[in-house]
């Protein structure tokens, strides 16, 4: 019997990352209201948000592994999710340019069969290029940063403005593949168990 692998996220980037691993997940968006959670510790916040998203979906299914994720970028001790407007995105990029930040991705993996749950956090240091105002405005006008935690997509146009990473590359895209492999192993699975 094949165990369903369910991604509790509407993120196309997370789905694509799983597909590169050989996992074609069932996608179930949780529609969880993130504003319900108010925590100041970034790691606790991304893990709690990931857990809540996974739990919403887990309560809707009878079996399978459910993966929830949430990402935030911290720059100068301030945490950022998706910008709410183009103006906010421009202001963030003016703070980010020539600076570095830490991208945190919370991972929650729920195993309905074993009634187990794991929480982990991937952490990656991101170094941004010293981009011009014209580059910032053009990038924001593309619409891409408005769809991304941290206001940039490493796998898209935003990759042009990232000079260096320290840590897991896929974590910055929204899902640490090495961390997921470790979590699967801890639950007694291998990645190959979910290959299509």
Curated annotation (Swiss-Prot):
Cofactor: a divalent metal cation
Enzyme Commission number(s) of this protein: 3.6.1.9
Residue stretches in coiled coil: none
Biological process per Gene Ontology, one example term: nucleotide metabolic process
Gene Ontology MF term list: nucleoside triphosphate diphosphatase activity
Catalytic class of the enzyme: hydrolase
Key words of the record: Cytoplasm, Hydrolase, Nucleotide metabolism
Cellular compartments per GO CC: cytoplasm
Keyword Calcium: no
Active site feature: 70 (proton acceptor)
Compartment(s) where it occurs, according to its Swiss-Prot or TrEMBL record: Cytoplasm
A Pfam family per the record: Maf
Catalytic activity, reaction form: a ribonucleoside 5'-triphosphate + H2O = a ribonucleoside 5'-phosphate + diphosphate + H(+); a 2'-deoxyribonucleoside 5'-triphosphate + H2O = a 2'-deoxyribonucleoside 5'-phosphate + diphosphate + H(+)
HAMAP family linked to this entry: Maf
PANTHER family named among the record's database cross-references: BIFUNCTIONAL DTTP/UTP PYROPHOSPHATASE/METHYLTRANSFERASE PROTEIN-RELATED, BIFUNCTIONAL DTTP_UTP PYROPHOSPHATASE_METHYLTRANSFERASE PROTEIN-RELATED
Family the entry assigns: Belongs to the Maf family.
Cited function: Nucleoside triphosphate pyrophosphatase. May have a dual role in cell division arrest and in preventing the incorporation of modified nucleotides into cellular nucleic acids.
Protein name stated in the entry: Nucleoside triphosphate pyrophosphatase
Source organism per UniProt: Gloeothece citriformis (strain PCC 7424)
